Amino acid sequence: MENKSNSSQLPTALRLGNTVTTDKSMIIENFNKHFSTAGHAFRLATSTSANSSAPPAAPRPSLSRFSFTQIQIADVLKELQNLDPYKSAGLDNLDPLFLKLSATIVATPITSLFNLSFISSEIPKDWKAAAVIPLFKGGDTLDPNCYRPISILPCLSKVFESQVNKQVTDHLESHRTFSAVQSGFRAGHGCTSATLKVLNDIITAIDKRQYCAAVFIDLAKAFDSVNHHILIGRLSSLGFSDDCLAWFTNYFADRVQCVKSEGMLSGPLAVSMGVPQGSILGPTLFSVYINDVALAAGDSLIHLYADDTILYTFGPSLDTVLSNLQTSFNAIQHSFRGLQLLLNASKTKCMLFNRSLPAPACPTSITTLDGSDLEYVDVYKYLGVWLDCKLSFQTHIKHLQSKIKSRVGFLFRNKASFTQAAKLT
């Protein structure tokens, strides 16, 4: 229903470094080089991470050991029967439609293969190869940073990961290992619950005639930058058995990707960092990776949702509020550096929430560890909601009106093309 400008077609030219190429075979190779090294942003931008270490794991004295249990045929059969037949095949060319139609026949041997992976702590290499499609998201068509990589993994790897993810999340949730301020990719949590929690805290402070200041933290290529060694250490601290750790070590090893577009395929390149894009396990593993960052918030409040982090605090004195926020922000930055996650200072913003209290035209700057001043903004889009400094939601309402107007206009212009059944729905 939307007229989307995003395109998966290759550009006529692409710039990598100081070189611009128009040869399409070189364009897909350059895209692959760019996407496969996206997770190196921290290493390239930071010569040293001195005085920064990964945040300490929260104490969990009675955490039981976690080991994989055998996957059942009935569960695999259900997964296969629920496959979307219109999804693309991965580099193994195994079509989801074929697996769906043959589910009752292939479920048993596939289940045996999955369980053999647990026993051997090995995953077939074909399941660790991704086809990446560059999707233009706007801006300079020559700039590879203006393209979003859409990763297509083999269908069987996603079926397998779905079963693994259920076991992992059951263990994590049953032992309440996730922080209460972590809402990303958890059952019963979501953008709505996270936004409501933050807004409730801010509105409560405003109603008490207190100042409230927030930092909206943006990380550069966060999912692509996950350090596998640190993540394995996190899993170990959460009670994962040696066999599980060996399986996850193999899961990350020897991953490759190729760029695929317009019938062409680049050569494979190794991907040595990050959680696999498009995977089922990736979001859960990323939540594990950043979970204990919340411990560094100190006197401020924090909420985590995937790679969207808000740090905020309030009180009767603006100077004290900003001082506390700066102290907490420094500690959070050290934690992110310890995880080798790079702060995107240009996209990290500050906001003062205030309806009636006197406030200076130029409040005290909140600065990064590198000495850059963060920009104060009056409007910011947080988890899909446009927040303004007075919490009037006027900006959000205007965006909704514009979107509704556009979609109603589309329906009106194309009403003659709709079937009678479509019109009735």
Where are these regions (language model features)?
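Surface-exposed loop/turn segments and immediately adjacent short secondary-structure elements
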Residues: 1-146, 159, 373, 381, ...
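Catalytic palm active-site di-aspartate
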Residues: 129-132, 148, 182, 214-222, ...
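Active-site-proximal segment of RNA-dependent polymerases
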Residues: 46-76, 122, 127-131, 170-217, ...
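Basic, alpha-helical interaction scaffolds
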Residues: 373-425
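Short, conserved micro-motifs composed of acidic
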Residues: 66, 263-265, 327, 341-378
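Conserved catalytic palm subdomain of right-hand nucleotidyl-transferase polymerases, strongest
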Residues: 86-94, 143-152, 193-236
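Conserved polymerase palm-domain catalytic core
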Residues: 219-305, 314
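Active-site palm subdomain of RNA-directed nucleic acid polymerases
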Residues: 164-182, 283-316, 419
